[in-house]
Amino acid sequence: MALLEICCYSMECALTAQQNGADRVELCAAPKEGGLTPSLGVLKSVRQRVTIPVHPIIRPRGGDFCYSDGEFAAILEDVRTVRELGFPGLVTGVLDVDGNVDMSRMEKIMAAAGPLAVTFHRAFDMCANPLNTLNNLAELGITRVLTSGQKSDALQGLSKIMELIAHRDAPIIMAGAGVRAENLHHFLAAGVLEVHSSAGAWQASPMRYRNQGLSMSSDAHADEYSRYVVDGAAVAEMKGIIERHQAK
């Protein structure tokens, strides 16, 4: 049966995902940045309360995946922390200036991760040559690759995802970016074994007082009175679709 991973940005969202049938959680911070490393406090609280597998993302900033020496040192430290806290896996990825996997740095990450399952995130979608990259990731011992098939969403990239799945000795290919209940059947019919979804929506802040003349963001148009939350009903709907597909 296909595995359902839900992207979560808080301990509460991880619990919602678990209660509604998620098989695994990718734990992140900063949804508007596409997911950054969660704080130590969030990591500890999730580790204590969530019982399904949780894989934290290790990404020190938004933007590209070519990191300075200082940023890479922080990545290694965060990998060690996640391992010490007892998480079963993590999500990360590093590219070089030419859009190839930075093999030297990824080897250091794999050594620091030890027995943890490592997912190479959507840095894969920014690489120059996906098939060569897939071979490199297999050589590194990467467990799975999260990809939209190098398109803006996974449905558009489904043909490339199918090509990657068919590639010999490839890691597990997990489809992600825009995967929802309404299009999930396309991925299941294509034989995708793992899907990744945010399964959520922006929720208004409970704050009644709002200082509309001041923003804490450099983006003047940012809505600072909303937060992204997992929709339990959406998770349950996706899980039900997967179970019904398996029963056919």
UniProtKB/Swiss-Prot annotation:
GO terms for cellular component: cytoplasm. One of its GO terms (molecular function) is copper ion binding. It holds the Pfam family CutC. It comes from the Bacteria. The keyword Calcium does not apply. Keywords: Cytoplasm. The keyword Phosphoprotein does not apply. Its main location: cytoplasm. It is found in: Cytoplasm. InterPro entries: CutC-like, CutC-like_dom_sf. Homodimer. NCBIfam families: PRK11572.1 (NF008603). HAMAP family: CutC. Belongs to the CutC family. This is PF03932 family protein CutC. The gene is cutC.
